[in-house]
């Protein structure tokens, strides 16, 4: 048995106390622990009492960590659980803390999904598939994901998708077919469905300025020809050059005309 000889308020936190047993510092305790066990100077504690106090204090430590972690932004159960594990809270205490967070609505996965949906639609250029992935990564239940992804699709305006496509298109140069492919790939990577992507692409004008396209073809021709002549010569060199340029999206008649203009066909 031990005796509580002193309980003092901690200097840096008025809601925590230092507990002294038999004149020796034993541990710091939270105000809730103090009240729950009605601890006071002169009280005699059995070993079982100390075990219960330590377990409860560990639980309270976990709650305080969780609340502080949740104070910065909304979190999911998975995120809170990982945070507590990283801070060496026991598995039993973690589950108790998680249960507490649900009871007090500190954790609410539907609220989390709603908030993330609004944030992504209003501040990012990402589509519903990226939204789905983010929900999955933080441990949101499948039924909630399947409920909120269609809502995301419905609330994200088609005009916004077209604007994203236009911005992508402005950064690309080259033949029409290649730019179309790059815009399609970029939109898919941003999480838009193929159906929405194809509808958006149908609204865009991919025609390129002929002078700019001619300059690009000339530059690509020089690069490709220089590279291919290290391996081939004669007619084979010409064919390999044409094949490479066609894979880049240039039309055969434009390539042939540029080859004639460059004098390569006469070599």
Curated annotation (Swiss-Prot):
It is found in: Cytoplasm. It comes from the Bacteria. Its main location: cytoplasm. GO terms for cellular component: cytoplasm. Pfam families: RecX_HTH1, RecX_HTH3. PANTHER family: REGULATORY PROTEIN RECX FAMILY PROTEIN. This is Regulatory protein RecX. The gene is recX.
């Amino acid at each position: 048995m031990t005796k509580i000889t002193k309980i003092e308020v901690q200097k840096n936190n008025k809601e925590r106390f230092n507990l002294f047993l038999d004149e020796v510092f034993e541990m710091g305790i939270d105000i809730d622990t103090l009240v729950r066990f009605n601890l006071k100077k002169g009280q005699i504690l059995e070993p079982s009492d100390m075990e219960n106090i330590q377990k409860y204090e560990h639980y309270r430590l976990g709650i305080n960590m969780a609340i502080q972690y949740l104070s910065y932004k909304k979190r999911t159960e998975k995120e809170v659980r990982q945070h507590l594990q990283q801070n060496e809270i026991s598995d039993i205490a973690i589950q108790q803390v998680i249960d507490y967070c649900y009871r007090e609505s500190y954790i609410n996965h539907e609220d989390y999904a709603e908030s993330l949906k609004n944030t992504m639609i209003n501040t990012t250029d990402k589509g519903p598939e990226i939204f789905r992935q983010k929900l999955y990564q933080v441990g949101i239940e499948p039924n909630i994901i399947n409920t909120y992804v269609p809502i995301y699709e419905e609330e994200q305006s088609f005009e916004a998708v077209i604007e994203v496509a236009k911005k992508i298109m402005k950064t690309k140069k080259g033949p029409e077919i290649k730019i179309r492919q790059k815009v399609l790939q970029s939109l898919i990577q941003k999480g838009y469905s193929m159906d929405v992507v194809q509808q958006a692409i149908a609204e865009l004008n991919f025609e390129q300025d002929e002078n700019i396209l001619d300059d690009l073809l000339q530059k690509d021709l020089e690069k490709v020809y220089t590279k291919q002549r290290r391996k081939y010569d004669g007619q084979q060199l010409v064919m390999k050059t044409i094949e490479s340029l066609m894979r880049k999206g240039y039309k055969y008649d434009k390539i042939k005309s540029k080859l004639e203009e460059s004098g390569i066909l006469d070599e």
